């Protein structure tokens, strides 16, 4: 009884005192080694590692991988972006892909707005800084064009993806069926009719063009179905005046881009046609001012369609012309008002004021009416 109480007291004492270490007996250690000591194999590996570390240069530290931020427009160093754009090179690292290079459209719009504000109010800026900011602004605008074109392209791909998939599967089935039919005709019948074989080969060629149309039709254009559902309403819709030159496929006719795909098969430019680098629209013809524009600080394969830039410039010019015409009309009206100060004119104005007080708001005073 006394021994058991002594053991309990010793256990409590050991639990309270952290300085007392518990050691196992020698017979439970195994080869009289400490339980925390490494095995001989592990110890030899550690020694070899230490020898290798000791052979390195004394002042050299082990290299640590640096974590780089994928967003180069994070705001930590905004000056570097302007320097890179002004120098005509990209701000991204060489190993970064092209998709990670460009920021979002909102970030680019904020950059453009801030740079325009700085150039508008910064009369005190040095000449070299102003030139650098102007070049950076051009780069931001071009990148915004690329980002928006990518967004539109992704939207068109998502919209017509399932239709393309179904028509590609249908064209593949037809092609396999025709190839099997040709094989049976050539192998089973020695006295084969040449007209029948030519007809099958023609159908094979048309089906191959159909398959390439479903795959390589421009992703940025509206996709016209080759195999419309016959169970739908058979009433032919009235053609729009804007799309009068576009052939609809309700009567079994091939769309205009089908012949463009056929020509691209001969020229070997199917990939360029699919990416929209040939500048061909839905009508099968090249659109006006749709040539590729080289982007400042970008690779040659990253281009912007010229139609968007041209339309934007035309709209800006039209807006400026309208503003000038309005200013000219206002100036003319003011001159007429100053030259005509006779009594009857004043009486008319006074009567107009009374009419306006009565609630008649149809007139603007007679100066700006046409």
Curated annotation (Swiss-Prot):
Keywords, ordered alphabetically: Coiled coil, Nucleus, rRNA processing
Ranges annotated as biased composition (Acidic residues): 354-370
GO biological process: one example: maturation of SSU-rRNA from tricistronic rRNA transcript (SSU-rRNA, 5.8S rRNA, LSU-rRNA)
Residues covered by region (Disordered): 1-107, 228-256, 280-370
Pfam families: Efg1 (PF10153)
Chief localisation class: nucleus
Coiled coil (residue ranges): 132-189
InterPro entries given in the database record: Efg1, EFG1_rRNA-proc
Compartment(s) of residence: Nucleus, Nucleolus
Extent of Basic and acidic residues compositional bias: 44-59, 313-338
GO CC annotation, single: preribosome, small subunit precursor
Signal sequence range: none
Recorded superkingdom: Eukaryota
Function, as annotated: Involved in rRNA processing.
Family from the record: Belongs to the EFG1 family.
Protein name as annotated: rRNA-processing protein EFG1
Native source species: Ajellomyces capsulatus (strain NAm1 / WU24)
């Amino acid at each position: 009884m006394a021994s058991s109480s002594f053991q309990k007291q010793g256990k409590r004492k050991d639990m309270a005192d952290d300085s007392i270490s518990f050691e196992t007996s020698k017979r439970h250690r195994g080869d009289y080694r400490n339980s925390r000591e490494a095995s001989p194999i592990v110890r030899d590996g550690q020694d070899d590692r230490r020898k290798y570390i000791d052979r390195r240069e004394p002042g050299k530290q082990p290299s640590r991988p640096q974590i780089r931020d994928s967003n180069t427009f994070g705001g930590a160093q905004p000056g570097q972006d302007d320097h890179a754009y002004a120098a005509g090179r990209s701000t991204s690292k060489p190993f970064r892909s092209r998709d990670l290079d460009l920021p979002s459209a909102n970030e680019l719009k904020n950059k453009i707005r801030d740079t325009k504000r700085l150039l508008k109010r910064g009369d005190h800026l040095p000449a070299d800084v102003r030139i650098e900011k102007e070049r950076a602004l051009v780069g931001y605008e071009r990148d915004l064009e690329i980002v928006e074109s990518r967004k539109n392209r992704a939207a068109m791909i998502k919209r017509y993806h399932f239709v393309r998939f179904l028509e590609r599967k249908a064209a593949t089935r037809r092609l396999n069926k025709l190839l099997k039919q040709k094989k049976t005709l050539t192998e089973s019948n020695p006295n084969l009719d040449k007209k029948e074989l030519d007809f099958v080969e023609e159908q094979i060629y048309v089906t191959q063009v159909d398959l390439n149309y479903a795959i390589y039709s421009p992703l940025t254009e509206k996709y016209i179905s080759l195999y419309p559902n016959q169970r739908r309403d058979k009433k032919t819709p009235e053609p729009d005046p804007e799309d009068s030159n576009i052939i609809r496929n309700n009567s079994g006719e091939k769309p205009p881009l089908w012949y463009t795909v056929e020509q691209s098969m001969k020229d070997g430019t199917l990939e360029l046609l699919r990416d929209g680098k040939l500048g061909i629209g839905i009508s099968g013809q090249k659109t006006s001012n749709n040539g590729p524009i080289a982007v400042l600080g970008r690779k040659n394969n990253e281009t912007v369609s010229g139609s968007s830039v041209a339309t934007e410039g035309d709209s800006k010019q039209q807006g400026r012309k309208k503003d000038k015409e309005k200013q000219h009309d206002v100036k003319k009206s003011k001159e007429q008002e100053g030259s005509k100060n006779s009594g009857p004119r004043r009486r008319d104005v006074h009567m107009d004021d009374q009419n306006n007080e009565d609630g008649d708001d149809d007139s603007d005073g007679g100066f700006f009416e046409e």
